[in-house]
Amino acid sequence: MNLSLSDLHRQVSRLVQQESGDCTGKLRGNVAANKETTFQGLTIASGARESEKVFAQTVLSHVANVVLTQEDTAKLLQSTVKHNLNNYDLRSVGNGNSVLVSLRSDQMTLQDAKVLLEAALRQESGARGHVSSHSHSALHAPGTPVREGLRSHLDPRTPPLPPRERPHTSGHHGAGEARATAPSTVSPYGPEARAELSSRLTTLRNTLAPATNDPRYLQACGGEKLNRFRDIQCCRQTAVRADLNANYIQVGNTRTIACQYPLQSQLESHFRMLAENRTPVLAVLASSSEIANQRFGMPDYFRQSGTYGSITVESKMTQQVGLGDGIMADMYTLTIREAGQKTISVPVVHVGNWPDQTAVSSEVTKALASLVDQTAETKRNMYESKGSSAVGDDSKLRPVIHCRAGVGRTAQLIGAMCMNDSRNSQLSVEDMVSQMRVQRNGIMVQKDEQLDVLIKLAEGQGRPLLNS
């Protein structure tokens, strides 16, 4: 039985009210909730049910060419944050609106389906009287061109999008133009593309802005201070420890831990995190002048030996490396000892003259990313040669990176490391920054200058700025 748009919406809305909207939908005649699990972004190959795929396909068949408002996309982004998975590729059509280009899995939550179906109903209602009777299969909002049918990997018969390694150069600002017009010659790295990227990332940042006692973010407990800055918080789902502002970050295939500069009260936990992670490199991007400023409360923990609770730390400087433009990296080795635990040695890369809320050049960023990657690889090889159980554990052997807040310089470096990894060749700048923001907080890549460096690195690789 093929459900009409109104029937599908009615059944989905009832289930959202009766069940959890986080359940995925399934369809065999009528819509039902898969109560056994919440959304995991599965495909048929990775464990999604055929009935889940049919549900997703059916919803998709009703939302082709549907224009999503900023409010619609904000609701989808809330789902992305909640599940730590982005299920949707959206394309801007101007004026803050978007269309759904593709679905990244064979599943869809009931709540997301409700958002999409309500957008379709709204557009259908608004289109009455504006389209002829023979065009009901391609309804579109007034003043908006009829766009190509929704491409979904669920339907192999539909034409594919252009390859990700060749950035899409048209269609982002085509509202009001006929489909037969010549292809746009707008540069994929020009002002229009940059403005669109900035707009999308700003929308995401606003969606992720923390409210008071926001359940999406880790909250301090036991009277201890958790965050250096009230607005720079730690995503609860990816938190490394309950007492640290530190997150597991995975951008494509690049896995790291991003954190704030530890508070004095957090040092024992911070060292324990470094040891348990078998940290292959600690990259400290906070400047020496910041550390020396007593008002900032930034303990000089990695350049000095000391005792922190039950943990004893020995620090030894090993070398200094020039990165270009006068930017220097001081190298240290931290030896962490705790009774009853293995002694752990952690290489440290400290960039002591990168000022807060600024960007170093793309050349310096590349050199720093390469130094951090090489240092980490050497240490990983050591653990592998010793048969360490940390090898193969995705939660361990991650570079730990922080500046002061852990969002600006930290994110610039993580983005560059991601682009250094050939396995991430299909990721756009939008992908990378969005994944960092969803997994830590909305301020990752804090300053425009830092985003500009990532854009320049992407342009040098022919990497797209925007999702297709």
Curated annotation (Swiss-Prot):
Cellular component GO terms held in the UniProt record: extracellular region
Enumerate composition-biased segments (Low complexity): 130-141
**Which residues lie within the region annotated Disordered?**
127-194
Write down the superkingdom of origin.
Bacteria
Top-level class of the enzyme under EC nomenclature: hydrolase
Q: Which reaction does it catalyse?
A: O-phospho-L-tyrosyl-[protein] + H2O = L-tyrosyl-[protein] + phosphate
Q: Mostly located where? A: secreted
Q: Which GO terms describe its molecular function?
A: protein tyrosine phosphatase activity
Q: Which Pfam families match?
A: Y_phosphatase (PF00102), YopH_N (PF09013)
Which ranges carry the Tyrosine-protein phosphatase domain?
152-461
Keywords per UniProt: Hydrolase, Plasmid, Protein phosphatase, Secreted, Virulence
Respond yes or no to whether keyword rRNA-binding is given for this record.
no
What turns on this gene? At 37 degrees Celsius in the absence of calcium.
Keyword hit for Hydrolase: yes
Cellular compartments annotated: Secreted
The record's active-site residues are C403
EC id: 3.1.3.48
The record's section on InterPro entries has:
Prot-tyrosine_phosphatase-like, Protein-Tyr_Phosphatase, ProtTyrPase_YopH_N, ProtTyrPase_YopH_N_sf, PTP_cat, Tyr_Pase_AS, Tyr_Pase_cat, Tyr_Pase_dom
Functional note = Essential virulence determinant. This protein is a protein tyrosine phosphatase. The essential function of YopH in Yersinia pathogenesis is host-protein dephosphorylation. It contributes to the ability of the bacteria to resist phagocytosis by peritoneal macrophages.
Task: Indicate the family of this protein.
Answer: Belongs to the protein-tyrosine phosphatase family. Non-receptor class subfamily.
- Protein name listed in UniProt: Tyrosine-protein phosphatase YopH
Which organism was this protein described from?
Yersinia pseudotuberculosis serotype I (strain IP32953)
